[in-house]
Regions:
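Short, polar loop motifs at secondary-structure junctions
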Residues: 35-40, 116-119, 174-179, 251-258
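Nucleotide-activated sugar donor-binding and catalytic core shared by glycosyltransferases
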Residues: 1-8, 19-32, 142-143, 266-381
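Conserved nucleotide-sugar donor-interacting segment of glycosyltransferase catalytic cores
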Residues: 53, 59-61, 85-164
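Donor-nucleotide binding loops and adjacent catalytic segments primarily
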Residues: 193-284, 294, 314
Length: 381
């Protein structure tokens, strides 16, 4: 069997698909990924073929600025859905579809799997007459957002003489307690257990990240790859260190330890490190609320403090709060003192950890990636 994955050129979109891609690979199937060339080292480490198509994430954003005069990161922070829709369903499709289609014709897939904001894969599936599965990151998009995407995709398909076919399967990583209350499962829904990202083959033999505990609570502070504002993070560190915490801080893709001058003997800094390792031996996770981090933390039963900045983060934050698994703030820069107080609260009030552990149990009930790969292969046999 030949399975072709598609993803927008962003780590937070690619990484949730990796466990399923590994599962197909480990079955002995032929697996490849269509996304930007910049991710070649990631796929080489995974022993998965990369078929490079389309620009980098930065390239898509630069084209958005040229076309619209709007910075899509700033638009995501201010909650402008039209700009986000244009970036994923307009600009990225325009810049990547033809190369992706050429690669797919040569690859001859039996199945296409596309993350929920990749619209190139479904269009390629229609062009080739191949079944496809879509894979969201977490809770479903609110109806107004989904309707805007559907309208833009319809226009993109019409310009290319394609149909807007619904997916054959909806691979759902969202545990019930986090899902939007009015959501109805689409046809072809299959649960898929989310996993905190780990290096291939490293599940049982990874190096410890830290020495012995000092007795202080340990906070994992992770702010993703798009919204890592070092000035804001510095202010949050100051607030956290006024409390008696140890802090494990991720630097994202662009920051360096030197950006956090004056911080501090109780802070450990980490470049790009698998979340599976970062979560070891921590007590609470402070995050902007990307779906991968939220689901990864909850899979370990860890409570959260969420300070969303943009993209899908406000959606995830609202669902964490509704489930009782953490404290969340409105989008934007939260007051550092209030954030530190929230961390202290989720550490000292057991109901937050209890809710997180309940969701962890729900996640364990979802089918593992190898089960889902077998089920899809059987359906296509």
């Amino acid at each position: 069997m030949r399975t072709l994955f598609f993803s927008s050129p962003l780590y937070g979109h690619i990484i949730p698909q990796i466990p399923l891609a590994r599962a197909f690979r480990d079955r002995g199937d032929t697996v490849a990924f269509v996304t930007a060339r910049e991710f070649a080292p990631l796929f080489a480490a995974e022993r998965i073929t990369l078929l490079p198509a389309g620009p980098t994430g930065e390239g898509v954003m630069e084209e958005m600025v040229c076309r619209t005069g709007v910075d899509p990161v700033e638009a995501g922070q201010t909650g402008s859905p039209e700009t986000v829709v244009e970036m994923f369903a307009g600009v990225r499709v325009d810049l990547g579809f033809l190369d992706a289609l050429a690669h797919a014709r040569e690859f001859e897939p039996d199945l296409i799997v596309a993350e929920a904001l990749d619209f190139v894969g479904p269009m390629v599936a229609d062009a080739l007459g191949v079944p496809y599965a879509t894979m969201p990151f977490g809770p479903a998009l609110p109806s107004p957002f989904a309707e805007l995407f559907a309208a833009e995709v319809a226009r993109a398909c019409e310009r290319r003489g394609l149909r807007c076919n619904l997916p054959d399967w909806y691979l759902d990583p969202c545990p019930p307690s986090l899902q939007c209350p009015d959501w109805q499962a689409p046809k072809g829904r299959i649960g898929l257990r989310p996993e905190a990202f780990r290096r291939d083959g490293a599940a049982g033999a990874r190096a410890a990240l830290a020495g012995e505990r000092t007795g202080r609570a340990r906070v994992l502070a992770t702010f993703g790859t798009l919204f890592a504002d070092t000035c804001y993070i510095n202010s949050l560190l100051t607030g956290l260190l006024a409390q008696d915490f140890e802090i494990r801080l991720t630097l994202g893709l662009t920051a360096a330890e030197a950006d956090f001058s004056g911080h501090y003997d109780r802070v450990e800094y980490f470049g790009f490190t698998p979340l599976d390792q970062l979560l070891d031996d921590v007590d609470v996770v402070l995050t902007v609320g990307g779906a991968g981090t939220v689901l990864g933390a909850l899979s370990r039963g860890l409570p959260l403090v969420v300070t969303p900045q943009g993209a899908d983060q406000p959606i995830n934050a609202s669902r964490v709060a509704a489930a009782g698994a953490g404290i969340t703030f409105p989008p934007g820069r939260a007051d550092p003192g209030s954030v530190a107080e929230a961390v202290e609260t989720v550490l000292t009030r057991p109901e937050y950890r209890q809710s997180a552990q309940r969701i962890a149990a729900e996640i364990r009930e979802l089918p593992a990636a190898d089960e889902v790969a077998d089920r899809l292969a059987a359906a296509l046999a």
